[in-house]
């Protein structure tokens, strides 16, 4: 029988852990952790995602703020906003909600965020740390969420053959690097891959992060261990006459062909938010490392 990997349930467990750590940090060091989200433009979907992040932050006792900017803001002005936040000692985590308008260079924006406050893990410094296997950088939230789901439900990842579909800088590449850190054998597939099903059918685990509605079907699976669906698309439901969220995989056609599967919604999405807040806590600890480390040393005497 197929097990549904409940991302909402696991995310709530992680949020409780983060909440407890936040309380301990505040009680012991009087540190109130704060996340700032920069939203450029009036994308309705982006606003929904941002409001959800703020609501989750509030629920666990983390301060948060949304900075809304005009869609046609000059790139240099956006960079200036980031500079101010980098210098603000009350801010511990900074993210710029994607997508950005086409006139803004996203890579330049990621690089401008202080790597210690880069809780999306997209600054080149953090990406570099991830790829060399260092443990002191911030890792992209979706990649962390996927690994946590797999470790919670599947447990041992060592030696597993994982096919990652998608080579984006946001999910595909960092997730592949993190899987390698867990001693997986990783195959990366993309739009130029010939005979995708040949790769997916022989994998232990398939992870798709493409954003193409229901493009994976029963022909792509054959008794696989797990399928993690990162993709999110809106489609029109002919039965309900309403828009609904679906993933990259056709859930009903796939679910009986794998042992573990994530739903959309309710799978990877909640885990991404949980790890955004966990990363913000980690960022605060990195920023205040000297204070925390010195205090720990006192207790060793």
UniProtKB/Swiss-Prot annotation:
Catalyzes the oxidation of 5,10-methylenetetrahydrofolate to 5,10-methenyltetrahydrofolate and then the hydrolysis of 5,10-methenyltetrahydrofolate to 10-formyltetrahydrofolate. It comes from Orientia tsutsugamushi (strain Ikeda) (Rickettsia tsutsugamushi). GO terms for molecular function: methenyltetrahydrofolate cyclohydrolase activity; methylenetetrahydrofolate dehydrogenase (NADP+) activity. It holds the Pfam family THF_DHG_CYH. GO terms for cellular component: cytosol. NADP(+) binds at residues 166-168, 191, 232. The keyword Methyltransferase does not apply. GO terms for biological process: L-histidine biosynthetic process; methionine biosynthetic process; purine nucleotide biosynthetic process; tetrahydrofolate interconversion. This is Bifunctional protein FolD.
């Amino acid at each position: 029988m197929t097990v549904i990997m409940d991302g909402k349930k696991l995310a709530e467990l992680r949020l409780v852990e983060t909440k407890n750590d936040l309380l301990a940090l505040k009680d012991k060091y009087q540190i109130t952790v704060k996340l700032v989200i920069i939203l450029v433009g009036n994308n309705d979907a982006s606003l929904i995602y941002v409001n959800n992040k703020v609501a989750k932050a509030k629920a666990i006792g983390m301060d948060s703020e949304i900075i809304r900017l005009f869609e046609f803001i000059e790139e240099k002005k956006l960079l200036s906003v980031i500079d101010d936040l980098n210098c603000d000692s009350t801010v511990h985590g900074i993210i710029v909600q994607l997508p950005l308008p086409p006139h803004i260079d996203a890579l330049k924006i990621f690089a401008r965020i202080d790597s210690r406050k880069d809780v999306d893990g997209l600054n080149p410094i953090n990406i570099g740390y991830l790829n060399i296997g260092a443990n002191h950088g911030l890792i992209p939230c979706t990649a962390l969420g996927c690994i946590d789901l797999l470790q919670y439900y599947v447990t041992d990842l060592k030696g597993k053959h994982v096919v990652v579909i998608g080579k984006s800088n946001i999910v595909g590449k960092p997730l592949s690097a993190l899987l390698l850190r867990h001693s997986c054998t990783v195959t990366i597939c993309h739009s130029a891959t010939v005979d995708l099903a040949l790769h997916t059918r022989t994998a232990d685990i398939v992870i798709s992060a493409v954003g193409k509605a229901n493009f994976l079907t029963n022909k792509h699976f054959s008794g696989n261990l797990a399928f993690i669906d990162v993709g999110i698309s809106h489609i029109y439901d002919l039965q309900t006459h309403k828009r609904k969220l679906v993933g990259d995989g056709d859930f009903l056609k796939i679910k009986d062909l794998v042992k573990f599967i994530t739903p959309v919604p309710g799978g990877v999405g909640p885990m991404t938010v949980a790890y955004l807040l966990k990363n913000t806590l980690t960022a605060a600890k990195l920023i205040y490392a000297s204070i925390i480390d010195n205090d720990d040393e006192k207790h060793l005497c």
